[in-house]
């Protein structure tokens, strides 16, 4: 378990702690105490707050959930937070978050124990056809605890565990890359900017793992993955700056899709820009897409940003992006994600 209260002391379902209840009305607090005692709990009141020690988080949430339903009929609104007794900092979680956490015990266990691995998808240099890097993609490490990465991150976000999962996935990717890749091979690793509230603090553990595993920082490329609008560009610029101060490269993913615009590319000035598949798919048959790609490449060239075409699934797409002047490419036509890295070069023979 991590020791940072923001990135997540993660209470397990068996962890002991105290639930803190509040109600606006004095009569409401009396009613809460009565209901808790009727359920076998031993509440203690301190001002407007009612403290109830529990043997486990799971027990607490199930009792509070039932209590909430009972009191709703009396018109009393209950607010509850959990404080886990094992935390050095004390970790406060509201009832809604706790309900999410116990809704999928297997997901909580996966995050708590890091029960996942990574597959690698090759990225080629279009000028030399050599494999210059691998993107790391989270996958289950066993059939016992299976998950879809998107669903796991969605659960983590609702359960207030997104920072924990993002940090674990980032560090695990670095460790995995140290075992499988030679020095000089770029390692493209996703990160969620919303999970990093203070770059200098939150990224210490990442840089520690880099050093421990002897990974050259210049071989790392951390790429922004964000499904929601970036409201604080200055914060993201600060994250990029922190990475680059340590010699790490940065990339902006999904260009041309959603909020990852060319204007954002020019504001952030990453080392790499990854163009979304929506612009690459059948670009050989779409002159409008080709024109958009040309303009994107021109503006990237001004800032010396290397451009990567994602989602290449056909030979014709590969040929077009190469002719247009893309530096790099990635996709199923080149190579699918795998446990082990693809060979050092790419050939179209037999494709």
Where is each model-derived feature located?
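Surface-exposed amphipathic alpha-helices with a cationic face
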Residues: 210-211, 237-249, 294-301, 322
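Active-site core of bacterial EAL-family cyclic-dinucleotide phosphodiesterase domains
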Residues: 95-154, 337-338
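Structural preference for beta-strand elements that scaffold enzyme active sites
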Residues: 117, 135, 186-188, 219-223, ...
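Catalytic-site-adjacent helices and loops of nucleotide signaling machinery
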Residues: 149, 158, 252-265, 318
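EAL-family c-di-GMP phosphodiesterase catalytic domain
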Residues: 1-90, 94-99, 130, 226-229, ...
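Catalytic core of bacterial c-di-GMP phosphodiesterases, primarily the EAL and HD-GYP domains
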Residues: 163-235
């Amino acid at each position: 378990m991590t020791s940072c209260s923001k990135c997540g002391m993660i209470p397990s379902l068996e962890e002991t702690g105290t639930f803190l209840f509040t109600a606006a009305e004095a009569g409401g607090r009396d009613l809460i105490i009565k209901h808790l005692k009727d359920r076998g709990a031993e509440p203690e009141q301190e001002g407007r707050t009612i403290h109830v020690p529990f043997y486990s988080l799971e027990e607490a949430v199930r009792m509070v959930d039932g209590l909430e339903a009972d009191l709703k009929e009396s018109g009393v609104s209950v607010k509850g937070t959990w404080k886990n007794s094992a935390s050095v900092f004390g970790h406060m979680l509201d009832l809604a978050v706790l309900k999410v956490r116990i809704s999928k015990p297997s997901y909580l266990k996966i995050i708590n124990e890091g029960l996942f691995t990574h597959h690698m998808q090759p990225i080629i240099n279009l000028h030399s056809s050599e494999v210059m890097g691998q993107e790391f993609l989270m996958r289950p490490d066993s059939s016992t605890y299976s998950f879809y990465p998107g669903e796991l991150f969605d659960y983590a976000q609702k359960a207030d565990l997104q920072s924990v999962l993002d940090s674990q996935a980032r560090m695990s990717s670095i460790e995995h890359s140290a075992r499988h890749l030679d020095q000089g091979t770029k390692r493209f690793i996703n990160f969620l900017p919303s999970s990093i509230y203070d770059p200098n603090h939150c990224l210490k553990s990442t840089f520690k793992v880099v050093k421990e595993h002897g990974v050259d920082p210049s071989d790392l490329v951390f790429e922004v993955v964000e499904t929601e609008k970036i409201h604080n560009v200055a914060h993201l610029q600060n994250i990029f700056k922190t990475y680059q101060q340590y010699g790490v490269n940065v990339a902006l993913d999904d260009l041309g899709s959603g909020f990852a615009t060319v204007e954002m590319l020019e504001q952030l000035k990453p080392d790499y820009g990854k163009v979304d598949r929506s612009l690459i798919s059948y670009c050989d048959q779409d002159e409008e897409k080709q024109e958009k790609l040309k303009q994107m490449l021109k503006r990237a060239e001004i800032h010396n940003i290397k451009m990567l075409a994602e989602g290449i699934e056909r030979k014709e797409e590969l040929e077009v992006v190469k002719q247009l002047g893309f530096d790099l490419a990635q996709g199923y036509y080149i190579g699918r994600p795998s446990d082990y890295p693809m060979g050092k070069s790419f050939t179209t023979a037999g494709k």
